[in-house]
């Protein structure tokens, strides 16, 4: 017997669009209907992406000391979270960190820096890093995430070989001013539009669990669709101690899967990435969520530790997913290296699915002398 979610998938596969009412229905589906929701959304995922999963790797080029006051962010002005703080990594350090992620199975490297936005000198610095990385790894995709862009900066990044630019809208316009006061929603939209106009693939997503309503989640998602985001990272709030969002837990694993499924129904042909908070909030439903989403980050995040990279790859393999681009990697890399379990078990430092809900502060990889979780 077909469910209403099957009928919605049929309509979308026939060329129709999900409406805001459809999105709300998915978001508010009864928990007992979760597998029906996933099965229907999964049809859309497989129609566009098959069983592949894109693996991305973050390199935090500059950590902490940001002048913006985003309430959710451990790097923001006023945050007391005990995160790693450091200035720009050298090109050598960036190549080392990116190489670890690529050897671990990633095909896209995301070069991220804290701050309101880059100076022209910062753009030159990142452009040089991108050129060096492309020289060493010609097939790598590079996404830059440097904050609000000024006129002409996106074009310079594109000319240097950067493929994509990430700048999340984070939440609905109607909710934006409750989470940050130092920049506006329109500032964020302007940067996404600048990136797209320069030929950079626009990557923009949201953070769930910021006190938004169901309607505001839907509002944010349709805004991302209207902006033409090629990739939508869906983050789940990590409530760091020392931030205004500390001790804020509004999400359940089922709720997170419903949010991802809603995103798939509204944006059936878009890369949907399970981003920050995956391990903390999805817990044992991580693999189920990948039947709806088709992209993850490998290993650690900007300031928090993620699941052990070996566990990420084992999860993909055990559930029959194929890592996008893995067929192009030479023998002995990616999953083979992880099966051998050769690297970096850090005692007490690795987050696993189902662990305690407090974010584990990143103490390895970029900005440290400890090997990366990749």
Curated annotation (Swiss-Prot):
Binding site for [4Fe-4S] cluster: 66, 70, 73
InterPro entries given in the database record: Aldolase_TIM, BATS_dom, Biotin_synth/BioAB, Biotin_synthase, Elp3/MiaA/NifB-like_rSAM, rSAM
GO molecular function: 2 iron, 2 sulfur cluster binding; 4 iron, 4 sulfur cluster binding; biotin synthase activity; iron ion binding
Pathway: Cofactor biosynthesis; biotin biosynthesis; biotin from 7,8-diaminononanoate: step 2/2
Domain Radical SAM core: 51-278
Reaction catalysis annotation: (4R,5S)-dethiobiotin + (sulfur carrier)-SH + 2 reduced [2Fe-2S]-[ferredoxin] + 2 S-adenosyl-L-methionine = (sulfur carrier)-H + biotin + 2 5'-deoxyadenosine + 2 L-methionine + 2 oxidized [2Fe-2S]-[ferredoxin]
Sequence segments annotated as region (Disordered): 346-374
One of the GO BP terms on file: biotin biosynthetic process
Chain residues that bind [2Fe-2S] cluster: 110, 143, 203, 273
Cofactors that this protein relies on: [4Fe-4S] cluster; [2Fe-2S] cluster
Enzyme Commission code: 2.8.1.6
A UniProt-annotated Pfam family: BATS
Keyword set, alphabetical order: 2Fe-2S, 4Fe-4S, Biotin biosynthesis, Iron, Iron-sulfur, Metal-binding, S-adenosyl-L-methionine, Transferase
Cofactor binding comment, as recorded: Binds 1 [4Fe-4S] cluster. The cluster is coordinated with 3 cysteines and an exchangeable S-adenosyl-L-methionine. Binds 1 [2Fe-2S] cluster. The cluster is coordinated with 3 cysteines and 1 arginine.
Functional description taken from the UniProt entry: Catalyzes the conversion of dethiobiotin (DTB) to biotin by the insertion of a sulfur atom into dethiobiotin via a radical-based mechanism.
HAMAP family: BioB
Quaternary structure and partners: Homodimer.
Database matches in PANTHER family: BIOTIN SYNTHASE, BIOTIN SYNTHASE, MITOCHONDRIAL
Record family assignment: Belongs to the radical SAM superfamily. Biotin synthase family.
Protein name in UniProt: Biotin synthase
Gene: bioB
